């Protein structure tokens, strides 16, 4: 069983039912809808198609709606792309103009107020770099230090500059409301800078009467500085290495990735490693050796999931990319689960203590499975963060939790009806394991649950169960 999960970005390359079915067969666990591109109708079609085919498979696939965020961009040019040479003077203005080689507008009207002489501005993911030489009320005059081509709507990064853009743009607010109504399982918030950025998201969720987990995308230096409070405030994180590698010195990214994974694991929150995982497979049927090693290292860091972007959304080999990533993960885990660093901190909650004890008992007894009964998914996440070699089954009566646990490392989620007693829970486990052939009569499983059932966050019990005892009615409670 593969433990680390795979996130696939949906797009034109995987529009057909056959392609979506092939993605799920190859190993997709979560589908990402990137709201930087496309309209609501096409995203709704993709969401509905994934849901339909996942239901046919009996296989949960989570849906992530990824908000564009307040991306700062150049405006449009009147006569196409322009090549900028070293030491050219290039002005970025808040005026509404059709751009020329010397002067172009920007989507961010606060740019002159945030910049000062000496600051660097990176254009198109750092392909072009300019240095601020003069600032006026409307214009930022710069000198080109890294030459290259500029064209319509290219992104701007301001490394080391504390920009004053809001956490949510007007587009993001509308997109968030759409995602909640459409049935998303997770929301991803782009360009997070502090823990406070979640407040506006929660306000809109409360207005809509829908609360779902929010993933913070770590792609700004301020987010790295505030990473501990961000992990505490959000429901998970994504190490978005594209913008992160532009805003930070690129040599800092590997250790930032490891630190993010470590903190998320300690907090029992999912962490996704993203960007350029198998980038060359956009146009090639096989990845580079470096990409394969990158995927393996993310697995060994302990990431919950690895994400494919252009590889699946617009690539020539989307299904092959998923299958390749699945093979890399499986091979790495097959020989290297023990290489994932164990958590050194002691749990500070009742649920954390019980799940840790369950994993330790399971290892001593050679248990076939660790089993969590959970309404919110919290017990399953706390068990998963231990990265035990024992497979985890998570039973839940909540459809949303059933889908969301598809993102959690090592967890196979099961939809089960609510019962009124823990003995009924054990019967559910027995029936599933025996009827599916997952475990043999007489093998052991370790179960964690809340007693009485039905109270979220009430995990307070651990039971060692011998498979077959419940369906055989060996005790009066099972009859």
Predicted regions and their residues:
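Non-catalytic helical/linker scaffolds that mediate oligomerization, partner binding
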Residues: 1-479
């Amino acid at each position: 069983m593969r433990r680390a999960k795979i996130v696939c970005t949906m797009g034109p390359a995987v529009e057909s039912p056959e392609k979506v079915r092939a993605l799920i067969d190859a190993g997709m666990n979560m589908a990402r809808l990137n709201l930087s591109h496309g309209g609501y109708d096409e995203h709704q079609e993709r969401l509905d198609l994934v849901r339909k085919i996942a239901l046919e498979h009996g296989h949960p696939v989570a849906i992530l709606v990824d908000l564009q965020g307040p991306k700062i961009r150049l405006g449009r040019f009147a006569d196409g792309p322009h090549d900028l040479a070293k030491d050219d003077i290039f002005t970025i203005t808040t005026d509404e103009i059709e751009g020329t080689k010397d002067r172009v507008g920007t989507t961010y009207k606060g740019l002159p107020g945030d910049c000062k002489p000496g600051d660097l501005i990176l254009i198109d993911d750092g392909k072009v770099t300019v240095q601020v030489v003069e600032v006026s009320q409307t214009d930022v005059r710069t000198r080109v230090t890294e030459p290259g081509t500029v064209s319509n709507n290219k992104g701007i990064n301001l490394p080391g500059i504390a920009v004053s853009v809001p956490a949510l743009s007007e587009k993001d607010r509308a997109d968030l409301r759409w995602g909640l109504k459409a049935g998303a399982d997770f929301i991803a918030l782009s360009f997070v800078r502090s823990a406070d950025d979640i407040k506006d998201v929660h306000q809109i969720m409360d207005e809509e009467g829908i609360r779902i987990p929010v993933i913070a995308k770590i792609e700004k230096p301020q987010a790295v500085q505030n990473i501990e409070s961000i992990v505490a405030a959000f429901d998970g994180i994504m190490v978005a290495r594209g913008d992160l590698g532009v805003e930070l010195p690129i040599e800092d990214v590997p250790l930032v990735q490891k630190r993010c994974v470590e903190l998320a694991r300690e907090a029992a929150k999912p962490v996704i490693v993203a960007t350029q995982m198998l980038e060359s497979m956009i146009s090639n049927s096989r990845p580079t050796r470096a990409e394969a090693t990158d995927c393996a290292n993310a697995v060994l860091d302990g990431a919950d999931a690895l994400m494919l972007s252009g590889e699946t959304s617009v690539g020539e080999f989307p299904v092959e990319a998923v299958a390749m990533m699945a093979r890399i993960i499986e091979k790495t885990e097959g020989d290297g689960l023990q290489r994932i660093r164990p958590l050194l901190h002691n749990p500070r909650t009742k649920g954390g203590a019980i799940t840790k004890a369950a994993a330790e008992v399971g290892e001593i007894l050679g248990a076939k499975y660790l089993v969590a009964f959970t309404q919110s998914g919290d017990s399953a996440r706390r068990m998963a963060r231990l990265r035990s070699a024992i497979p985890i089954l998570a039973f839940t009566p909540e459809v949303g939790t059933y889908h969301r646990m598809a993102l959690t490392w090592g967890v196979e989620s099961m939809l089960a009806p609510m019962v009124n007693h823990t003995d009924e829970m054990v019967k559910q486990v027995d029936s599933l394991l025996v009827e599916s052939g997952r475990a043999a009569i007489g093998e052991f499983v370790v179960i964690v649950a809340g007693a009485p059932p039905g109270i979220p966050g009430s995990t307070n019990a651990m039971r060692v169960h011998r498979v077959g005892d419940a369906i055989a009615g060996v005790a009066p409670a099972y009859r």
